[in-house]
């Protein structure tokens, strides 16, 4: 499995590396022109937008790499590897989490450098919200641990939901406009999921660990369903 993970990381690093190098370049260059912008808020807005784009394109690369390696010509090679589908999906998920963690770390370091360079006190906290890092205002390690676990499994369920939708769009139930269908199904799923979450009893929502357990259940569900679809329902183009 380690060899499979190594191959997955090496075969997908180029698009991630390009976006991260662009962001690092912007972080190094922009402080030199901060006086031209006139106000620090202008610099903040520019880099915050770029940070958002870095995270967005990281997610986009995760989805594209999964699609390319599973449902294009490369998919035939992937499906003939001497490993089972559970291992393939797990390795792809692990690779996605690694690249997302690297992107988040680079964004954090880059914005920290900018906040020190241009002395914007609220800059770093704003990017923490973008990346999803918990705000630590006091030493409550139990809450911090809960926040990190919830964040991890929210990210995991988000990635696996994309894997599931893309896989479902390549079953015999959908034969035309598969990419458009996958996008439509994904947004319908987001809407239905939000409505379902709103209907849950308040006593459940007040439990500190509810969000973490909910995301863990979603992650397991999407993982198992994706493996099942690829093993039993997949229809290659």
Give the predicted meaning of each segment.
Residues 1-75, 85-237:
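Hydrophobic alpha-helical transmembrane segments of membrane proteins
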């Amino acid at each position: 499995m380690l060899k499979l993970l190594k191959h997955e990381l090496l075969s997908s690093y180029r698009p991630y590396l390009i976006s991260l190098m662009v962001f690092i370049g912007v972080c190094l260059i922009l402080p030199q022109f901060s006086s031209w912008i006139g106000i620090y808020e202008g610099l903040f807005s520019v880099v915050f937008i770029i940070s958002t784009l870095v995270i967005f394109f990281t997610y986009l690369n995760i989805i594209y790499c999964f699609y390319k390696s599973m449902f294009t010509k490369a998919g035939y090679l992937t499906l003939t590897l001497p490993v089972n589908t559970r291992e393939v999906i797990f390795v792809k998920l692990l690779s996605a989490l690694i690249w997302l963690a690297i992107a988040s770390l680079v964004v954090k370091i880059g914005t920290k450098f900018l906040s020190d360079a241009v002395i914007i006190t609220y800059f770093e906290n704003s990017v923490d919200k973008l990346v999803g890092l918990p705000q630590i205002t006091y030493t409550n390690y139990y809450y911090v641990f809960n926040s990190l676990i919830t964040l991890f499994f929210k990210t995991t369920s988000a990635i696996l939901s994309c894997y599931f939708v893309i896989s479902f769009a390549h079953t015999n139930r959908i034969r035309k406009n598969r990419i458009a269908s996958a996008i439509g199904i994904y947004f319908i799923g987001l809407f239905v999921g939000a409505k379902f979450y709103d209907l849950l009893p308040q006593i459940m929502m007040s439990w500190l660990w509810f969000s973490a357990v909910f995301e863990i259940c979603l992650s397991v569900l999407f993982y198992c369903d994706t493996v099942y679809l690829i093993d039993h329902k997949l229809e290659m183009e």
